[in-house]
Amino acid sequence: MTQKGIFRNTIGALTLTLSMGIIAETAAYADEGMWLPSLISERIGDMQSKGFRLSAEDIYSVNQASLKDAVVLFGRGCTGEVISAEGLLLTNHHCGYGQIQKHSSVEHDYLRDGFWAMSREEELPNKGLSVSFLEKMEDVTSVILEGYTPELTEAQRDSVVNVNSKQIIKEVTAEGKGLRATVESLYYGNQYFLFLYREYGDVRLVGAPPSSIGKFGGDTDNWMWPRHTGDFSIFRIYADKDNNPAEYSEDNVPYTPKRFFKISLGGVREGDFTFVYGFPGRTQEYIMSEGVRYVSEISDPAKIALRTMRLDTQKKYMSESQKVRIQYSSKNAGVANAWKKWQGEMKGINRLGTVAAKQEYEKRFAKWAEGPEYSTILPRLDSLYGALEPYTFAREYYSETAASVELCSFAGSVAKKLAGGDNEGAAALSEAFFKDYYLPIDKESFVATMSAFVKDVPVEFHPEYLKEELSKYGSVSNWADALFGESLFTDADKVAKLEAADTAAMYADPAVRFANEFRKWYVSDVYPYEKRLNREITLLYRDYMRGQMEFEPKKAFFPDANLTLRVAYGSISGYSPADGTYYKPQSTLEGIMEKDNPEIFDYDIPQRLRDIYAAKDYGQWAITGDNGKKTVPVCFIATNHTSGGNSGSPVINKDGNLIGLNFDRVWEGTMSDIEFDPEYCRNISLDIRYVLFTIDKLAGAEHLLKEMVFVK
């Protein structure tokens, strides 16, 4: 199979059917959709009718530089954009947070104070961080299913898909030079796309504001509007002297991009066209009512309660110690992010009546699908969801309780590495663990969450190990005293002295035993059953998805997000979250000063910003506020359909210029992973002018501004 053959037009009868759904007249709701860039020509008319001035080729092209060449997958879960001819890269502060933390210490607290490289020599390398540019995407459905016939079993179909996928990936990455590829299933396996990337592994930290700007509002404001968070960080991509990907080397030079974003200083106004280009992570737009009911009535409430326990414990100790605050800043942010999202998702689903609406849709579908091909799908799905529920519940509780115990996870990982002779890997794990570990937090969280596991997970799902330990110690609290008191993995010096020969002692350690026994229980008693049931559900969704497309031939179906590059477009728009309340789409520096409070950590801004505000020293970044006085724009909201993974995505105006970077959604609209509602769903973006203001006036890093190209 040649590369030329792989990239030929492979659209067969099945793909044509799907494309008819994709090409259809309008989306289900205005501004709903995460569209594949390679098919954006089918949406460009709608985009242009809403104000967009560029062409489909300007958005995505394999024949010339296009906007896609300025967008990267940052790490393995965020988006970034190139903003200069010298590889300068912009993403969110929370996307770069882990790198900022790794470079921080009590002596050099870059989380608290910020960091700015005033020369190329001061830019900090980040081992393990990479960015990936999409070279091309291609429908390869016919190639992937070559050799498949309806007579084959699902296992045989999987084999065909896997063999053909590996062959395609091998051929398209043969050149090397940082190429990597994936074959992704769309529409539950009705369609397959090849994504070819070029990955750069030398990405250096250039600048980050202090957390009092980059995380302003903290967990209090997370998912909320109005928002005033300066959520950005700056990196630079480096390459070898031929501009090819290379691991870190002092000989590397700044990457020269095919395309970078020009920066608009024109600002935003209600109704302006907006366009988000990024890598949304996961959506479930087409699941049936029973799947939504489990999320809103069982899963979200349970996970919220469990994470509340951990967050309360972390915050208590973080407020008492600067060292602990630094150690747990990133961990706390990670725990809180989904915690608040789940709350908004649950409320949004209930407010919209999504379960009832889907049930009504399913009744109409069932009436239409009275023939043999689709008539049994919904009853079978309903039955499978009922069988799946207890296993999913057990898995989610395991993930939020036993698997979240820091000591035990660490102990299990180190023991495994030492037993395999990987002393260097064990030492690296140990160094990273003890740098950011505080035992009282972990122990108190253990007692709270494991007590919840004992109470909430049905007894028939309890591991035998759990029953034995509770019988032995009488309570979770006593069990915690013994486990944390007796484990040698709480002592860095003892861990450093361990060798592979100590295998027996390691595996007898209570922390290692906890990790291994719970893992063994999950692997044997939960995972196989959940996997089998999910597999059966997915196979039915392949048919249900195809049936929905036939049922609604004029609806534009977009594939669920799967961390592949997508286009979402909409407009600048305020919204009304409650009766008598309307939120304007722009926030300003005035809002920061209204919230500023040195007594509240989330709202304690740098003194430098207070001084700038007092002097009204805003420079060219000033605008006239609603009160007629000068201020600085901070954030804005729009109707673009986004998800996790869109963090850091460029927000682009009608001329293709950068106006901001996406970093959040409003709390009332977080159910958009399941159902998009144009009245409530808003993505929150950082205004690029606040980024520039911060670089100029707070950081004094004018040299970075000189790299950028500005347009009015």
Segments (PLM) and residue ranges:
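Bacterial N-terminal signal peptides
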Residues: 12-22
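Terminal presequence/propeptide segments associated with secretion/organelle targeting
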Residues: 2, 6, 22-712
